[in-house]
Structures are given as C-alpha cells and as structure tokens.
Amino acid sequence: MSELPRGSTIRKDAGLYGYERALRRHGIEPIAGVDEAGRGACAGPLVAGAAILPPGKAGIVPGLADSKLLTERARERCYEQIVRRAVSWSVVVVSHEECDRLGMHVANVEALRRAVALLDLPPAYVLTDGFPVDGLGVPGLAVWKGDRVAACISAASVLAKVTRDRIMTELDASWPAYDFKTHKGYITEVHSAALTAHGPSPIHRMRFVNVRRAAGLEPLDPVQNGEEAVELVEVTEGTR
C-alpha cells in the first residue's frame, strides 16, 4: 500500500467523496473501496465487499454512510442504489470453517483480496478501511475510519453488511434457538445464554474463547496458533 499521490491533500471538511476527488485530480481512475462485515462475530461467515463508484453526480449514493451507522432499512435502500449505480461491485463470502482454518486476520485479508479480484473492472487504486492489504497488485491507501470518510469504502461496507445480515437471517431458520436473525452472530446476552444452554451450533467459530468454553474446550494457545487478540478474548456486541 502507498500514500496519496504527491501534492494531494484531503481537507477535514472534504466530505464523503473527498478521497475519490483527490485521486481523480491526479488522473487516477478507477478507484475501488473494499471492506468487510462479520470479523467480530463468533458465528456465521465473514463477508467482504468491493465497489467502484462512477465520478460526478452518477456516483453519489443518497444516504450513504458507514453501514454500522445506518438502520437496517437505510442499509437496504443504499444497497439497492449501490448495485444500480456502481461501475463494478463484488461480494465474497468466507465460511466459518475457512475462518477457523485460516484464523480471522488471514481470513479477513484473503476476503478483501478476493473481493477486489472479482471486480469486473480492474481498479487502478484501492482504498481500504483501517489497515493496509498487501497483494492487491495496484497502489492503495489504508484510510482511518475509511467507511465513514471515503464513499467507495462506505459502499463496500454496505454491500458486505447487507449480504451478511441476509445470510444470518436465512441461517436462523436452521438454528432458531440462537436467534441469529437478531444479533447476526455477535455476542449479546441472548446469544450468550443460548450458547450456555445449547452449546455451539455447526456455524459457530471454534477459535473464539466463548464458543470453546460453551463446547467444554480449552482456549487455543496464542503462541502455538499464532492468533491475534481479537480471537482469544470474549467478543462483545457492537464489534465488527
């Protein structure tokens, strides 16, 4: 990943489309944003989205913002606008089994790479949310709180979040005791109580401490397994 082109600046009041405008002033196009949903959940898949929005008014999505800041209804409205307006977009689903096999950080990076690779139009530049993603094959920039300040990342976050929420709602029909349709696999009091009462379902991620505890298993050794902290602590409601 790299920095913005020499001479580029982003004003704090540049708005949601400031990064894209700054890059286009240097002739950089197309610009993709990529983000994920479900990293902090202890059940269900990890989903990554990527989006390239057109320049100008055609790329302005009414109501677009970080998916976590939108209501479910608002996210659905934005989703429909994004798939209609985007020059190219993609969604990648990484199963809970693959998350367990790879570990969450590796699975997360792999999902983001796959989402960019699936775009019909290869991007010239990629904006990512929060941390750099190597192996994309093009220059890019990690943007702090990117899903709140860069439109293409916000669009990607909506694609990922809506897709994952729909999947978790469908999975709820198979395992209704866990109420996946409500908490989407994140830990809440209801989810914790269900884990205690029923043990893990087939779609729970067995690397998480609370899931292993419910299964009567010891936590994974972080040294032997190379796990990052997020996988070895109790996950709480509201994490990604």
Curated annotation (Swiss-Prot):
CC cofactor note: Manganese or magnesium. Binds 1 divalent metal ion per monomer in the absence of substrate. May bind a second metal ion after substrate binding.
Binding-site positions, a divalent metal cation: D35, E36, D129
Cystine pairs: none
GO biological process terms held by the UniProt record: DNA replication, removal of RNA primer; mismatch repair
Subcellular localization, as worded in the UniProt entry: Cytoplasm
Keyword field: Cytoplasm, Endonuclease, Hydrolase, Manganese, Metal-binding, Nuclease
One cellular component (GO) term of this entry: ribonuclease H2 complex
EC number(s) on file: 3.1.26.4
Predominant subcellular localization, coarse grouping: cytoplasm
Domain named RNase H type-2: residues: 29-220
Record GO terms (molecular function): manganese ion binding; RNA binding; RNA-DNA hybrid ribonuclease activity
InterPro entries named among the record's database cross-references: RNase_HII (IPR022898), RNase_HII/HIII (IPR001352), RNase_HII/HIII_dom (IPR024567), RNaseH-like_sf (IPR012337), RNaseH_sf (IPR036397)
CDD domains, sorted: RNase_HII_bacteria_HII_like
Reported cofactor(s): Mn(2+); Mg(2+)
Reaction catalysis annotation: Endonucleolytic cleavage to 5'-phosphomonoester
Function of the protein: Endonuclease that specifically degrades the RNA of RNA-DNA hybrids.
Sequence similarity: Belongs to the RNase HII family.
Name by which UniProt lists this protein: Ribonuclease HII
Originating organism: Nocardioides sp. (strain ATCC BAA-499 / JS614)
Lineage: Bacteria, Bacillati, Actinomycetota, Actinomycetes, Propionibacteriales
Gene name per UniProt: rnhB
